[in-house]
């Protein structure tokens, strides 16, 4: 058996605080330092301040996101409601009864809360008290941001990072790119050769973090972007990442969770009736949806398939259907 965590861990297990599990599966260590993943500067830039009551809707189960984003909020003297992935009704009730001022989660879930709140007859600007939102884990449009800011009367800013390295970049008030975090050294490289590209050229984000516990040097994230070194009106001198324009590989990201092709193949391989399959990812109304299209002459095990999907793909929701005649699966 090989060494734990690929031999990249430099400390004894007793010096760690936690070890998490991310989709892949990938194991992510956390040492005992404060704000191990380095998100404090991003939350401050987004507008979170001492005295805010913040509802954190990222999962606290196995994956690191919940605690990853709670620690920096505590550094800023914010109180945190560890709501996790609780159902929409409870989330809205908590927001209203506790007069929550900050939201942390995916943009699609905030949109879902807005839609459900309006269905319940809530005036989101008057019945809720949200002032600031920090979102990550998904791409979203400026139209969606503007819509949510108007619905709730709040400021919404985004951050970018991974479970492996933590914070890589974040938006400031001017929202003209992602300031590269102080803890990160970022290169934009050719996806095939790993050779750094010139500023402004689109390539793969490759990051090195100054972490003495878990050595990750020139980690290729699989995301595509570019570097912008033009001065920012906010006064920060760090270069900025442009928009994330795509992925290098065929990995899909659904509601902040990665789904890898080999995970799907492991689930599908159990069902001999399925001849071909295809994953379809859409974002109607700003909310991620995934469909699993299957080709089978006769298939009556949809419930079993979806159950195995939920187990094999870490709870990422999907619906299964057969494609229309003539449509490739």
Where are these regions (language model features)?
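Conserved AMP-binding loop of ANL adenylate-forming enzymes
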Residues: 40, 44-78
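Acidic/glycine-enriched edge-of-secondary-structure segments
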Residues: 21-34, 70-79, 100-107
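Short secondary-structure capping/junction motifs at helix and strand boundaries
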Residues: 29-30, 47-53, 79-83, 157
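Short secondary-structure boundary/capping elements
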Residues: 14, 34-38, 61-65, 83-87
